[in-house]
Amino acid sequence: PDVILVGEMRDLPTIQFAVTAAETGHLVFGTVHTVSVANSIDRMVNVFPPDEQPQVRSMLAGSLRAVCCQHLLQKQDKSGRVLAVEVMLNTDAIANLIRKGKTFQIPSVLATSREQGMQSMDVELMRLYQEGIVSKEEAYMKANNKADFESLFEEQKAKEAKLSKQGGLVVSSNETPKAEENKQ
């Protein structure tokens, strides 16, 4: 088959199969229950024995195409839930971090690669809060880095305070990167 769907990758044989299939040219879709894209990569690597992990990181760096992490959040108006998505595409910078075992640096790359279609969870949560879709508390609960999220919130408050002192017209653009167009 050209495309393989692996329902849940939670053990060594399943992850080993998925990685090997991807390495041999198959398009593999799979799920891993984690809270971030970096955690997803770590989970796949860490099921292997320590002596095999460098090779697995190298295989993932070469064959991985994208990782998405999803959270459902309660809407502020209680009318249902809204999807928040973290998106990582396997660029040269990401592949290098995976290969070197520096997945803890992936959030920094996500935060600065929006124009390439990537999106960090914390920035997406802040957007949902700013647009009045979710409460600050709901967004904060799902934030990957609570301190960074709080900093984003404080920056936003400072910008709003500065604008309110200046007066005048404020125009907002709802332009979104191509990776977000299909989710709305």
What would you call each of these model-derived segments?
Residues P1-Q184:
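Short, flexible helix-loop junctions that flank or precede catalytic/ligand sites
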